[in-house]
Amino acid sequence: MLPYNVRNAGGGSVGGILRRTGQGSGTGSTILGNGNSPGALGAGKVSSSLENHRQPPLELLVFGYACKIFRDDEKAREMDHGKQLIPWMGDVNLKIDRYDVRGALCELAPHEAPPGGYGNRLEYLSAEEQRAEQLCEEERYLFLYNNEEELRLRQEEDLKRLQQETSGGCFSQVGFQYDGQSAASTSIGGSSTATSQLSPNSEESELPFVLPYTLMMAPPLDMQLPETMKQHAIIEKTARFIATQGAQMEILIKAKQANNTQFDFLTQGGHLQPYYRHLLAAIKAAKFPPAPQTPLDQQNTDKEAPSADDHSEEVAGGRRNPNQVVITVPTIKYKPSANCAYTQLISKIKGVPLQAVLQEDESSNPGNSQHSGGTASPALSCRSEGHNSQGGEFTPVLLQYNGSTFTHEEESSNREQQDDNDVNGGEPPQVELLKNTSALALAQNYSSESEEEEDQVQPEKEEEKKPEPVLTFPVPKDSLRHIIDKTATYVIKNGRQFEETLRTKSVDRFSFLLPANEYYPYYLYKVTGDVDAASKEEKTRKAAAVAAALMSKKGLSFGGAAAAVSGSNLDKAPVSFSIRARDDQCPLQHTLPQEASDEETSSNAAGVEHVRPGMPDSVQRAIKQVETQLLARTAGQKGNITASPSCSSPQKEQRQAEERVKDKLAQIAREKLNGMISREKQLQLERKRKALAFLNQIKGEGAIVGSAVPVVGPNPPESAAGAATADSGDESGDSVRSIPITYFGPDDDDEVGEQRPEMRLIGSTQKDEEDDDEEDGGDLEKYNLLNDDSTNTFTSKPVLPPTAAPPPAAVLLSDDDDVQLVATTSTRSSSSRHLKTHRRSRSRSKNVRSSDSSPSSRESSRRRRQKSSRLSREPSSNPPRKSQHSSTQRKKTPKKRRRSKSRSRSKSIRRSRSISILRNNRRSRSRSPSCRNAEQRRQQDRRRTPTKKSHKRHKRRRRSSSP
């Protein structure tokens, strides 16, 4: 047994072969089941052939098991003799295999036919019923004998051929009549007359071939020509298509029409291949233009009418030949409502409200007989008989086509009668203007259900055509005229600036845009619609040139003159953009030449008067001088202009425009100068604020400024200049330079009753000065930056030389070996050192005030004052300055003096260490982290051991302090 899933997938198995059933399996099983009936075998063959034809082949699945086969000759011999068969139903003559399905049947008597055979099994029915049953049997088993799909396709093809034959020879699927079935039935009845009248192509296809008169290349004599005009038409159309589309399309058509005998001329062996090649070459050489298509009515009239004049008279009179083919075209009346999408679209396009559009439609189309906007429809169409007043329904109205125009079916007969009466009466026939139909006309011919149709038809109004103007300039050829017309259309839409763009883009192609071109007048005529536009523009151009020449003689610019000459064309002035700086507050110049109002002039004058008080005297004098020169020049021009009365008004406008421009330029110059001055003043004020803040900080710390010490020696030129600048700075108050400090506060360690003057001589070597300068050199950078006036470009007052010579210098000597020089005035660097030293002395004095009673504190204060005075000197490169200093010295005992010296030595050692640490820190900022670590280790080692320089300084002080 097979597995269950395999049996289900296969749909059953026979001998290990599984069969997948298809759609027709049911029918096949029915046939095989009824195999006992006569003719069942043949029916089975027919059904199998139909199944193979209709359905795809069945999918077969072969499935089996592997088994071993053993050779057993004895068993095979028994099988051949049929020893394995058993009798069926006890009949020894009929033996079956044990696997035979007939073994399941026990009794055959109910299933056997009677001894005489079956008679008519429908004998119990009446004759009509038996006839109906036979028809049902035929329909029931029709699929066994006939293919329904092929039969249905054959019927559809026959129906299409019948429709083509009855529709007048055209290939339209829908006829021009709503009652197409009745027309088809009538045409079937009289097919001979219908085909003769409605199928002219059939007659044309049978016409013999005549060489077309438009073919200017005659074919050779030995070339085989087509037999009929139909073959020629196919060849001609194919040749024209291939000539326009290319040779690739010929290959495609040849592949698609390989089985069509009408396209045998495309193959190499076709007998019409040379004629096709000849037509193709003539079309490519432009020697075979297409023939104009003549309407059918003209052909019929040419055949029947003896002369062309009679035919023209018939067409002009509107008469129709009774034998002429009439084609009826249905039209349905429609009138748009207010909420119609078409009406809303028209209102948006025209830019008018909906009510105006509806009124315009009603006024232009009162009887639905004529349409506005140039759209055409049949002239007398859609009378009220096509409209049903009960439910708003409408019926089609037929129009007759006589070859060139559409007319109403009933009115055509009436018009024929009227034409006959007119001819007999003597009135000349009037030509009726008819328009072509379009989709818009059909849309306007529909009538809405909400409104009733008007029955009265007003006669159409003849439009009066304006006479065409006479062109005095040359008209270009058709190709160039088309380009000029298109360019003029774009220029009208986009403006004359588009003309400038085209002129700069391509001069050769658009040469007609140049005024010197011969077709420029035609171009202007297309743009403006005026024939004399070119002459008018030429006159304007000449007037502008004359004005420019006059202005150049007077020494004026032509910008204002051109604007004055073209006063009527102010809209053509060029657009100018003024690019100015952010700080400049000057107004933009006017693009169009116009007079400035009184408010603007008053505001400008007020602004000028407001700006002037803050300006320096020299700048004000320069501005006044420029203004006087401008006024003198304009006055001279005014005299010259008044002397010439011929061109007074344009030159007056030019003069006024130039005056306004000059005033604005002067105002711009004043504002720029004022802006520069204001920026300098801002920088000055900022420096003042910084200096005042620094002074307030010094005053807040409790510094008391004393009177200056009188100078005892001659000042060098630098000191004298510094003093002069300080005095001038105090007088002007515009800027603060530097503040020299020569006094460091009162002596807190003075003892009452022990004051006595003491003269000392203090001497120092050059090494001490360098050390002191190096100590305080880096700490004074910030203050020097604050008091640096190198960026100040304005000096309020010049430096005055000293009036009186200073007294001779005096040197104060004391019991010490050092020499001390004190200067009343110094440069900016010395003053900064004074300030720094003053801060250090104040900090030290606060620490020492706690021990005022000890004599060592008094000695240390004296040492600090000496050190601060030494720091106030200039660097070693500058020459030394001498000054006079008077102070009170106190006598001390030798024991107290030694203590104070030892303390001062220890303090100086600590101070030198701290200064060296700070200096190394500054140097290590610009180094790498590894270098910084190495520098820190060196500084720690230096803190432990004093430097060699400090040892030398201690030795010198020890020797000087020893008695």
UniProtKB/Swiss-Prot annotation:
Compositional bias (Pro residues): 799-809
UniProt keywords, alphabetically: mRNA processing, mRNA splicing, Nucleus, Phosphoprotein, Repeat, RNA-binding, Transcription, Transcription regulation
Chief localisation class: nucleus
Biased composition (Low complexity): 718-727, 820-830, 848-858
SURP motif repeat residue numbers: 234-276, 483-523
Biased composition (Acidic residues): 768-778
A single cellular component GO annotation: nuclear speck
GO molecular function: RNA binding
Composition-biased stretches (Basic residues): 831-847, 861-870, 882-913, 945-963
InterPro entries on file: Surp, SWAP, SWAP/Surp_sf, SWAP_N_domain
Region described as Disordered: spans on this chain: 290-322, 360-430, 445-470, 593-613, 634-662, 716-963
Keyword RNA-binding among record annotations: yes
Bias-annotated ranges (Polar residues): 364-375, 637-651, 787-796
GO biological-process terms attached to the record: mRNA 5'-splice site recognition
Composition bias, Basic and acidic residues: 300-317, 407-418, 458-468, 652-662, 934-944
Residues annotated with Phosphoserine modification: S438, S447, S448, S450, S649, S912, S914, S916
Functional description taken from the UniProt entry: Regulator of pre-mRNA splicing (and, possibly, of other RNA processing events). Regulates its own expression at the level of RNA processing.
Free-text note regarding domains: RS domain directs localization of proteins to the speckled subnuclear compartment and the purpose of this localization is to allow colocalization and co-concentration of components of the splicing and splicing regulatory machinery to permit relatively high rates and/or efficiencies of reaction and interaction.
Name of the featured protein: Protein suppressor of white apricot
Protein source organism: Drosophila melanogaster (Fruit fly)
